[in-house]
């Protein structure tokens, strides 16, 4: 059962800035395994490129047989064949196999998981780093989304001016993601200010390597701290549980739905809040992730909303709440 794959360039509607970079386009890899759809959106930050993804897909292509009965076993076999730093490659294969498996059962993935899609929390819509005027314009354009996630982390002074202006413009639920861009003293000052602005939580305030800083910040923070870059897979959670209030799970960094489900179980055992997030992705990966929505507290599944040329259609939003099609598999079809 060969893996068919193709590279697709996602064009962003607007330049998308985070603390580390600004992008106008993103290359992803779409795969098809016997009618099962998957997607890889690789990140150099986690050790992958388009070339490593396509090379690794070719290496395992002939190892996937069409007659598998036990999906967890099959995904485990494929994981063992891939290099360690191949999370988005594994994620693409993982979601394609779930798509095949649930199509054979003629049920959507959420029914296989055993959850009610109506119980998904509302998703945030992300405002990337830009000039204050442009960020305020983006807030206006996002009128239909009740929860906004604001990207910060390049300059703490400018960050707080932007947040003050955004809060003056809207009373929506606001979340902040610094992508590890602040130093400890900056983070303390910023979080104090953000608490006054009634921000819900702050995501990854410090660099993932600043463990001592994160431990100190956890003790004094006036807002809940959600960790993203520190938490890649389930085994990372026990190491970080003592200095965060919650975690951000992404299929592209953990390796797919199977590992995401393990992460949810481990995080709950440690009493942590859970968010399902995303990279810039098409509706293939976003919709696959949305099936996990009823299991978590927060969603940030807007990657497909930031692109102008999504080649697939699947989950949509109504007042910020995911609406997952009642279709077999991961509930995605090519856009007409």
Regions found by a protein language model. Give the residues of each.
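Flexible C-terminal active-site loop/helix
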Residues: 1-12, 23-28, 279-336
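Metal- or metallocofactor-binding catalytic centers and their adjacent structured scaffolds
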Residues: 7, 34-104
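Short, P/G- and charge-enriched loop/turn segments at secondary-structure junctions
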Residues: 15-21
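Conserved, mostly hydrophobic/aromatic
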Residues: 31-33, 93, 106, 177, ...
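Hydrophobic residues within beta-strands of alpha/beta enzymes
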Residues: 38, 148-150, 202, 247, ...
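Metal-dependent enolase-superfamily TIM-barrel catalytic cores that perform enediolate-based chemistry
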Residues: 111-221
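Catalytic alpha/beta core domains of metabolic enzymes, predominantly
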Residues: 209-301
